[in-house]
Amino acid sequence: MSRQQHQVCGDPNRFQVVADFVITQFGKRVRYIADVAGGKGVLTRMLNKKNLDCELIDPRQKSVKGIKHRREPFLPEMTDYYDLLIGLHPDGALRELGEAALTRPVVMIPCCNFWDQHRRGQKELLAAIKNFYQDNDVRYQEIVLNFKG
């Protein structure tokens, strides 16, 4: 009898791809990581298994067992403790995560446009984020990760 897997929507490989990216880009230079609006905490668990101290920040009550979980909405003021913030499809926390990049390194993989009230398409979303970073002198790099959705 095999153990029950957590059901996820979207490309199930995205968690592994992002975890590998974090290891490759940051390695041991980061110690404390926040998985912002990370749903059930699948990415949090993967990063913990790679010996990184990752904590889920998400107001939803359900999460995988054995992870640290702050059950509250993410606010940019929470960043002092963390070396790196990750938002894999952070939805409603997208804008707050973007603002947190003013003070901390952020890996942000947006999906839906929760940046502003107009909810425009993907190109407009990325342009709005880039403009915000440029206006605030935030260094950023746009990359494409190898997963769908």
Give the positions of each predicted feature.
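Hydrophobic anchor at the start of a short beta-strand
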Residues: D53-I57, V106, V138-Y140
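Short, charged, surface-exposed secondary-structure boundary motifs
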Residues: V64-K68, F114-E124
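Active-site capping/gating segments
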Residues: R120-G149
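SAM cofactor-binding core of SAM-dependent methyltransferases
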Residues: A34-E77
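A short SAM/SAH-binding and catalytic strip from SAM-dependent methyltransferases
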Residues: D83-L97, A101, C112
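Conserved beta-strand signature within the Rossmann-like core of class I S-adenosyl-L-methionine
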Residues: R104-H118
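S-adenosyl-L-methionine
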Residues: M1-A34, K40-K49
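Anion (oxyanion) recognition and catalysis
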Residues: N48-K49, G98-L102, Q134
